[in-house]
Structure formats: C-alpha cells, structure tokens
C-alpha cells in the first residue's frame, strides 16, 4: 500500500443519470465505488431493490436494458488553491469501461480499460472553490462493434473481444450476462504528488550459508521540476535528489535492515542478506512467514514525501519437468491416459513430470479455480474475501487459480493468500477466444488492432508491477484456453500475445517466476494428461456420455480415471444447499417439473452437443442414477448436492493414490459469481456445498481410500506431510443391520508416501449375490486425527439399506447426532459452515459437529438428511 500526503478521496455520494428502457429520465444519488446496477439497486429501482433481488428467479433478464444506455456519473468537490499547489492529479483505479472524463465542463481524456488505473494531470482544469467531475459511460457492446471485426471469435459472446473488462459478465456457463458500467474502484485527487512508487518488491537471489540474499527493487517516478529549482514546495527541502530509505522487518516486527539511497534513477536496487530466514511455505507444509519491506521517499530533512509497504515471503520455487523413461511406471501410466485423448494426440510419445517444489519440498497442489465473487466486482467486501480464503485453507486446499475471464483481484485477495499460505496461479485476462493482434503476419493491420495491443500491454505492465511482490503467486498463465491448438498453429494471435506482449514484461519485472504461455499447456497439442497443465473440462463430452448413456455403474472408477501430471481444471457439478436455493428460486420452481428456474441458474455450455442434455441435466440425471428417484423437491436438492461429494471424492482419492504421477488437481471451480447450480464448491453466499466437504476430507494430510484391485480389497493410506506417520486402521464390514465383520491393522506411512494394506478374507462379503448387502467402512486414526473412507461394490441407489433413524440435538455451536442403523451421506443443510458434513454413521454411533454461521447467513434453521431415511 502506498501512503501519500495531500490527497482528497472522491469516494462517496455521486449523482448518476440516464434513461430507463422506456426512455424515462433517471437521476439518482449513489455510492462510489459503484456501478449502474449497484446504484439502481441502492435506490430500490431494480425490481424492488437490494443486491440479491436482481439474482432472484429470472429477474436479471428484466434489467438487461441497462447495458444499452449511456450513463453519466457526476459529483462536486471543493478545492482550495494556495501558493504551494503546483500540481493536481486525479486517479481512477477502476472505470468500467468506455468513458469520457470532464472537469468543469472541459473534457480531459477518455478511457477504455476496466483493468487499468488511470491518472490525469488536472492542474489546468481545476479552480478555487467548487469543481465538478463528470464521467460519461458509453455502452460497451456498441463501442466494441465499431472496431474492425475480423475472425475474432469468443465463446459465449463475440461482443467482448476488444473490450478490456470482465469477460465472464457477457454470460458464461455459470453466470448470467451483466454488462455493466461505472466506477468500480477508488477515485482520489492528489496534490503535489511529485513522487510515485510504481513497484516495490523483494526477490530471492539465492540462499547461501550466510542466509537468504534478497534483492530490493523499486521502480518509481519523480517530477524533476520539483527538485531542480524550477519551483519549490515550501513543505520540503532539497539540495539534490530525494532519498529512498529501505527498511526490512522480520515476521515478528523486528527491524533487521535499514539503508538510504539517492533517488536519481527510475529504478533502484539494493541487496540484503537475511540471516536464519524464516521461510514461506504453502498451507500444510509449514508456516507462511511474511517479512515487511517499506520504502520511504524523503527530503534532505528526513520528511517523508511518500511511502509504500509490501509484505514478502522468502521462498524458492521451481517446477521440474523431467522426461519419463520408456517402460517406467510413469511412462506406462501416460500411455494408458491416451485412452482419454482424441486423434490430435496420436503419435505423441514423449511424456514428462510436472512437480512443484517450494524450498526444495515437493508440493502436492490441491485446490480449485477462483472466479470473481460478484458480477459487480467492486461489491466484493474484505470480509467476503476473508471468508472465502479462510474456507479454502480450512478445507485443506493450498492453491487457487485466478481464472483469466475475470479480473485482477483486489489487493486484499492476494494479501490473504500470502497470509494463509494459499498458492496462486494468476492468469492474464483473456479467455476462450481469438483476440485481436497486430504485427507483420496480419494483412492490412488497422489502428483498432494496434490500439488494442497497446492497451493490453499497458494493462499487463501495470498489474504485474502491482502484484509481483506477493509470495503466494507461484506462476503466471498467459491466458485461459486460447492456445489449445498447441504446436499445430505457432502464429495464432494468443501465442503471439504471450510471446511478444506478456513475456517481455514478465522478464522485465519478474524474471524468476515461471510463465506458461497459456493453460492448458503441454505436449504437441495442448491439454495433454501426460505432460504440463491439463484441463479435463475439455473432455466434458466424456463425462456427459457416461452420465447420460450409462447407469453410472463404476462411477468411482470412472471419475477417478481422469488423472494427469497437473490438472488445472477438473469438472465437478452439483447443487448448493436447500437453504441457498431458497434465496434465488421461488418455492414453486423448486418443485416444478419444468425445471426452468434451475436451468436458468445453471446456464449451459455453448457446444451444440449440450443443447438437449445441458449442465442441469447432468446434475439431475447423475443424482437420480446414483442415489435413486427423488421423493420430493427437498430430496432432489439433497441428492443433487451429494452428487458433488461423490464426484469430488472419487477424483481426489484417485489423485492421492497416484501422487507419483500426478502432483496437482485444481477443480473447476471454487466459488460462485452469482447464485447458481453448477460447478462451484462454495456457493455465492459463502456456504460450502457437499463437494467442499469431500475436498476437505480427501485433501487432509493423511487420508484413506478403499479399492478393489486384482480380486483383492486394498486399503490405501496417503501421507502428504513432511514427516512419517504411524496409523491405526479399523475396518468394518457393515450391512443394513449392523457390523458383520471387523479387522484392525497398523501402518507406518513415510513422508509423502503411500501404503497399501490387504485385509483378510473380506472379498466374499462384497462379491456375487452379496455385493449390494454391505459396504466396507475404514477408519484411520493418526496423530490425533481420523479419516473415514468407504467402499461399495454397487452404486448407492442399489444398496440394500435398512431405514435408519438419526437423531439431532443442537445446543449453541454444537450438534450431536446419533443413529440406530448405518446412515449413509448424513447431510446438515443450513446457512452454516460445519466441521464435518456428508458422512457415514455406523450403527449406534454418536458424532459431534461444531457449527459457525456462513458469510451469507440469513436463517438459523438446520435440516437433516440421509440417504436411507
């Protein structure tokens, strides 16, 4: 954060004016940061008002007219000129998107990038006393249509390809269309800001026996007229250039380094050796220690003109991609994965590992994709960021990928990831499209294309400088799914943007952090399970065929078959809690046979093959096939929710058994942009779905799974910790009437290791005519923690389960559950985060659950569901 004296915030109340869909004049007061949607909601002019009303039912369509109108934002402010005032600037951290800015009726500039912070010198426009700033916003789609339209296609909408704003809000398969306009970040006036720090960072140069050698890097600007005597600000005194004072504090706040330097050049570097450094590790592998670097720009008398502070972590990151030896186990696994591939992969016979090391420790990456937490991103509060990032850590995740169709998130997001040890992959903001480019390969390049490339270059440079200090960012991705042609087209626009725009900027500011030109990335044709970054969302048709055209027998093995060296998008589909669905669907639509409300809030994939079997059909059909016919609307929601649990469990248990081959799995997706069924693990309101609890369980340091291999039942115990573990294992064979067989074992699991145990003579109970009568439940007790895995030879809907009676007692923040019979998929539904959920209870077993209110808590009700109720 940069601290500068002499500034005036223009956040607060502005006047917004325009016309409604009937051309009636609108003029209202609204809060900035704010956009057209949020200000109309603030004034109860969107379907009764309130942020959530626009999300209820199909109300969003009734406000679509907003995107076609021009809107004017205006406010007055007072300014007092003194003899010392020599320079006045106005800074807009976020303007969405095409707009014209005026001060006192004089146009000062226009803007065309919502991802860019604009600063303008308004010294010649401002006056003593009352001043007026006005911003006229123009409809983005109308502006985009004015540019030359070559073959610039985009998934979901081609109306976004020139426009540098949040791409997903043109409509995606998980969010409605919300093409908004407005001021979505802070507005500030700066007086006599002759010095500005653009970039401050501490980079690890290496670790020696003496300590960690850190390069302190500062890039800034200063107005030379301020220092060479052309004019003087009486607040400060200079005989020469200003001074920069670097200060480093350790994680305990103790000052360990201080050094002053003359600020003569745009870039300053200094070096400090940190003795006995406390290293930054991702969650689950150690503490995420943060040091503090402050740069103060001073005059000769030591008075501070401006200062900037960043936190940094001392960590060494490397990604090892080593070719597999032919006939090795990894090579054989890679060959098997060709069964998933298309003809485009034919002939590919070189495979390679993908292993992330932090401080020489191999990291197994577990997490999900982050999308904007609101279609109006200025509405995402610090509390919502904290809730979501904390939930990720509590869910045993250690990585989020910031997806390229959203935005560069607020500083608070990255600060929280630094603090909680959540690693970040950061995409640059291009997704699922062919974006404009301009170079020698373009026939008759136009000014439109040249301006787009320059706009993109400025956006990239500014945001890299803003984010480079964060230790949580472990690598950059050039775009999302724009280079899936791989080596078949080496001169496509996306590859040229990565090579000629993005890569040079990263070499300049962040040369040591890895850059992948795109994701997926790897192999001759990108999206290979056998090397690099893979997107299994690109194989959605295989999931679709399995759900639509089979009875889903063997679903655990099917979902678990999709492993890769590093999966950057693994799909999972499900429904949120009933308490959440009630927030965005009216009661009649929760039970209607048409499912129009569900489909509206699920959206759909643009591929023609999903026209008649859309994403909602995947959820609805999959839930019915796995868990049986729906008893009522509430049961439908319950079963569509636990579909996500079983899908996630199947994937992650397979990954945990395959960590010699696969080093990471990032689900599509972590959070929601609006209230929806679909892909997320945590819903829009901050309430975890069943998939989240499966992720939490299977991503724990020690976790188990039960498989049937080579005619034997096998217990697999995985340890992702950095120390070996001793475990006690108890296996129970449970029928509808009770436990019919038990066995206990012990095991020692090496750090980063996998142990396979073979129980005795249990196969006969789960084979042949008996396979639907019992399940295997395996408890692993290790270091004070416990994991419970289960195995069934048939789908849950085919099990012969006796009806269980589960009793719930609730007191304060504790819930006690007790059952008389085996209870499958016990699910607590409410606006809460539970310490555990969607679990199995053995006959006569009691279980205690702790609860805390979720971020969007609005009801104290908790309902209880289980499969054999």
Regions found by a protein language model. Give the residues of each.
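Substrate-binding clefts and catalytic carboxylate motifs of secreted carbohydrate-active enzymes
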Residues: 8-9, 16-20, 179-182, 476, ...
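Soluble or luminal CAZymes and related metallo-dependent hydrolases
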Residues: 69, 179, 210, 384, ...
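Alpha-helical packing segments of well-folded alpha/beta enzyme cores
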Residues: 72-76, 388, 395, 413, ...
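Short alpha-helical segments and helix-capping/turn motifs at coil-helix boundaries
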Residues: 105, 118-122, 170-174, 501, ...
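Glycine- and acidic
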Residues: 275-278, 394-400, 445, 628-638
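Generic structural signal for hydrophobic
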Residues: 391-392, 417, 467, 655
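Substrate-binding/catalytic cleft of secreted carbohydrate-active enzymes
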Residues: 399-419, 424-605, 643, 664, ...
């Amino acid at each position: 954060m940069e601290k500068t004296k002499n500034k005036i915030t223009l956040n607060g109340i502005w006047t917004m004016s325009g016309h409604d869909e009937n051309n009636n004049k609108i003029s209202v007061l609204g809060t900035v940061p704010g956009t057209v949607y949020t200000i109309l909601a603030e004034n109860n002019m969107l379907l009764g008002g309130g942020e959530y009303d626009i999300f209820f039912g199909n109300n969003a369509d009734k406000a679509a007219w907003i995107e076609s109108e021009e809107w004017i934002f205006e406010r007055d402010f007072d300014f007092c000129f003194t003899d010392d005032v020599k320079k006045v600037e106005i800074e807009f951290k976020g303007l969405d998107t095409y707009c014209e800015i005026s001060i006192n009726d004089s146009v000062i500039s226009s803007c065309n990038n919502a991802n860019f912070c604009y600063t303008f010198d308004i010294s010649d426009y401002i006056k003593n006393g009352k001043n007026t700033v006005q911003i006229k916003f123009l409809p983005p789609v109308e502006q985009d249509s004015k540019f030359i339209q070559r073959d610039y296609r985009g998934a979901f909408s081609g109306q976004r390809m020139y426009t540098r704003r949040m791409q997903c809000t043109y409509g995606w398969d998980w969010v409605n269309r919300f093409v908004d306009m407005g001021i979505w970040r802070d507005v500030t006036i700066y007086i006599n800001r002759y010095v500005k720090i653009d970039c401050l960072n501490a980079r690890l140069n290496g670790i020696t026996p003496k300590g960690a050698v850190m390069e302190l890097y500062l890039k800034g600007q200063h107005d030379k007229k301020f220092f060479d005597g052309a004019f003087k600000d009486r607040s400060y005194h200079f005989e020469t250039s200003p001074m920069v004072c670097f200060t480093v504090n350790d994680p305990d706040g103790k000052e360990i380094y201080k050094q002053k330097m003359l600020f003569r050049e745009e870039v300053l570097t200094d070096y400090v050796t940190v003795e006995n450094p406390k290293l930054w590790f991702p969650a689950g592998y150690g503490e995420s220690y943060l040091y503090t670097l402050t740069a103060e720009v001073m005059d000769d008398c030591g008075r501070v003109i401006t200062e900037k502070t960043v936190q940094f972590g001392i960590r060494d990151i490397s990604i090892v991609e080593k070719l597999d030896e032919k006939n090795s186990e990894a090579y054989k696994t890679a060959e098997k994965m060709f069964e998933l591939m298309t003809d485009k992969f034919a002939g590919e016979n070189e495979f390679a590992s993908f292993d992330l090391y932090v401080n020489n420790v191999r990291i197994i990456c577990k997490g999900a994709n982050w999308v904007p937490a609101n279609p109006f991103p200025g509405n995402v509060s610090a509390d919502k960021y904290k809730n979501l990032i904390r939930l990720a850590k509590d869910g045993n995740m250690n990585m989020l990928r910031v997806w390229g169709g959203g935005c560069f998130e607020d500083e608070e997001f990255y600060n929280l990831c630094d603090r909680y040890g959540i690693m970040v992959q950061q995409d640059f903001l291009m997704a699922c499209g062919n974006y404009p480019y301009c170079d020698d390969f373009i026939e008759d390049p136009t000014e439109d294309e040249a301006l787009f490339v320059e706009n993109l270059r400025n956006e990239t440079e500014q945001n890299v400088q803003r984010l480079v200090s964060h230790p949580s960012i472990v690598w950059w991705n050039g775009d999302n799914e724009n280079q899936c042609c791989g080596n078949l087209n080496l001169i496509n626009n996306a590859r040229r943007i990565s090579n000629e725009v993005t890569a040079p900027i990263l070499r300049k500011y962040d040369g040591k952090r890895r850059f992948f030109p795109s994701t997926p990335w790897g192999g001759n044709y990108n999206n290979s399970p056998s090397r690099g970054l893979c997107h299994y969302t690109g194989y959605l048709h295989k999931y679709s065929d399995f759900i639509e055209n089979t009875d889903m027998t063997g679903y655990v093995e099917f979902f678990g078959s999709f492993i890769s060296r590093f999966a950057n998008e693994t799909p999972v589909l499900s429904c949120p809690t009933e308490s959440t669905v009630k927030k965005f669907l009216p009661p009649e639509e929760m039970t209607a046979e048409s499912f129009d409300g569900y489909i509206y809030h699920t959206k759909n994939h643009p591929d023609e093959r999903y026209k008649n079997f859309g994403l909602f059909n995947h959820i609805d059909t999959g839930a019915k096939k796995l868990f049986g016919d729906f008893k009522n609307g509430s049961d439908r929601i319950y079963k569509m929710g636990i579909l996500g649990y079983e899908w996630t469990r199947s994937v992650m248990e397979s990954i945990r058994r395959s960590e010699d081959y696969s080093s990471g799995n990032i689900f599509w997706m972590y959070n929601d942009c609006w209230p929806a069924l679909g892909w997320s693990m945590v819903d829009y309101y901050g309430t975890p779905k069943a998939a989240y609890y499966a992720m939490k369980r299977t991503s724990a340091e020690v976790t188990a799974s039960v498989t049937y291999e080579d005619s034997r039942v096998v217990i697999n115990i995985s340890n992702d910790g950095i120390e070996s573990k001793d475990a006690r294992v108890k296996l129970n064979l449970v029928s509808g009437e009770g436990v019919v067989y038990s066995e206990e074992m012990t095991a020692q699991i090496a750090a980063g290791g996998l142990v396979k145990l073979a129980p005795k003579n249990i196969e006969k109970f789960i084979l042949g005519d008996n396979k639907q009568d019992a399940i295997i439940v395996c408890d692993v007790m290790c270091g004070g923690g416990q994991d419970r895995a289960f195995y069934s030879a048939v789908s849950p809907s085919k099990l012969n389960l006796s009806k269980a009676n589960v009793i719930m007692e609730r007191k304060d923040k504790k819930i006690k559950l007790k059952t008389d019979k085996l209870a499958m998929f016990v699910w607590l539904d409410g606006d809460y985060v539970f310490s555990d959920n969607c679990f199995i209870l053995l006959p006569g077993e009691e279980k205690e659950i702790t609860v805390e209110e979720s971020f969007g808590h609005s009801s104290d009700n908790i309902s209880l569901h289980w499969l054999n109720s």
